[in-house]
């Protein structure tokens, strides 16, 4: 009788260890997915939340009914003209994205402007990043020149930021710290 109970307990322990191993394996898989953004706005919100009070500046984000003060906001991807005018996203390529968010310096957008775009076609992010770079570098600037342009990817998201060197460097450092999959494609002077 004792042998049967001992075998039953051993079987229960073996099964419980096996199920714990599967749960831990699943947690690891979902942990990897956890590091991937759910949408464009999430990327900017996470990065902005890492700014200290001293690092933050007067900001605005989003477009139209999604406009936010002192925080990032969702940008309407159906408004190709606004994407181009405000963020430097080429209007001819607006159909290639299905989600966008923005964060801009409230007083002078040339100090800091950032757009995050979800690319519809997986694998097309780098090609689209090149078109964004060309469009921004071809602009005619008023009220001073931004110092630099940085374009990065986070999975299927393209992140474009231009402005003062200190502000763009702070943003890119915080983005890279938040998302390990961040890949810098361009870091070029504008002025």
Task: Specify the residue positions occupied by each region the protein language model found.
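C-terminal motif of bacterial Sec signal peptides marking the signal peptidase cleavage site
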Residues: 15-19
């Amino acid at each position: 009788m004792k042998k049967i109970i001992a075998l039953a307990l051993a079987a229960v322990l073996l099964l419980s260890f096996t199920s714990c191993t599967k749960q831990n394996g699943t947690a690891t898989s979902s942990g990897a997915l956890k590091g991937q953004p759910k949408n464009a706005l999430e990327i900017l919100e996470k990065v902005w939340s890492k700014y200290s009070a001293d690092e933050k500046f007067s900001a605005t984000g989003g477009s139209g009914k999604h406009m936010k003060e002192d925080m990032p906001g969702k940008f309407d991807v159906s408004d190709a003209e606004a994407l181009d005018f405000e963020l430097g996203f080429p209007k001819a390529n607006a159909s290639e994205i299905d989600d966008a968010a923005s964060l801009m310096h409230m007083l002078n957008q040339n100090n800091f402007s950032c757009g995050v775009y979800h690319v519809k076609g997986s694998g097309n992010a780098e090609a689209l990043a090149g078109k964004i770079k060309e469009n921004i570098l071809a602009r005619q600037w008023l009220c001073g020149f931004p110092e630099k342009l940085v374009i990065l990817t986070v999975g299927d998201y393209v992140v474009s930021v231009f402005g003062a060197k200190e502000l763009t460097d702070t943003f890119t450092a915080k983005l890279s710290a938040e998302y390990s999959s961040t890949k810098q494609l361009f870091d070029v002077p504008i002025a």
